[in-house]
């Protein structure tokens, strides 16, 4: 399970070191293999352990090829999906098109979402989280969805 937001750096070759606390799980359950693709609604990447990525692929493949919206979703998400493998130093390499989509430069945020990570440029992340908090502070924010939710 991946939780929390961690500041990380992209090196000159387009690699990022996965924080040590996550490496054992990724190595043990997925042999260090992950799948990265674009988020279709946000300027970030989605980084899944390989087994979770396979589950997402099955869902995408189940969509209709005859529905234009579903076909676009398949094209974008599967077309950008790239298998990545952690190297001996725990780094993952992001391809040029993936880095371009998320506007990745040196400073990044690795954001745990339990079953996956979101990868954000630090600038985009801070803008997005400020907007999310502002919207979340309104009285009617997701009121129906949160009626039965408790922490």
Swiss-Prot record:
GO terms for cellular component: cytoplasm; nucleoid. Its main location: cytoplasm. Keywords: Cytoplasm, DNA-binding, Repeat, Transcription, Transcription regulation. Disulfide bonds: none annotated. The keyword Repeat applies. It is found in: Cytoplasm, Nucleoid. InterPro entries: MraZ, MraZ_C, MraZ_dom, MraZ_N, MraZ_sf, SpoVT-AbrB_dom, SpoVT-AbrB_sf. One of its GO terms (biological process) is negative regulation of DNA-templated transcription initiation. The keyword Transcription regulation applies. Residues 5-52, 81-124 form the SpoVT-AbrB domain. One of its GO terms (molecular function) is transcription cis-regulatory region binding. It comes from the Bacteria. Forms oligomers. Belongs to the MraZ family. NCBIfam families: division/cell wall cluster transcriptional repressor MraZ. HAMAP family: MraZ. This is Transcriptional regulator MraZ. It comes from Haemophilus influenzae (strain PittGG).
């Amino acid at each position: 399970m991946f939780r929390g937001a961690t500041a990380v750096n992209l090196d000159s070759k387009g690699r990022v070191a996965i924080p040590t606390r996550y490496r054992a799980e990724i190595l043990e359950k997925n042999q260090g293999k992950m799948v990265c693709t674009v988020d279709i609604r946000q300027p970030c990447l989605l980084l899944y352990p390989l087994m979770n990525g396979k589950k997402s692929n099955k869902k995408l493949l189940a969509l209709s090829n005859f529905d234009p919206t579903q076909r676009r979703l398949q094209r974008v998400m599967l077309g950008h999906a790239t298998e990545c493998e952690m190297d001996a130093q725990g780094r993952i390499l992001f391809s040029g098109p993936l880095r371009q989509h998320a506007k990745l430069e040196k400073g990044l945020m690795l954001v745990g979402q339990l079953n996956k990570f979101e990868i954000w440029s630090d600038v985009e992340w801070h803008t997005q989280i400020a907007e999310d908090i502002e919207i979340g502070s309104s009285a009617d924010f997701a009121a129906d969805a949160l009626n039965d939710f408790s922490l």
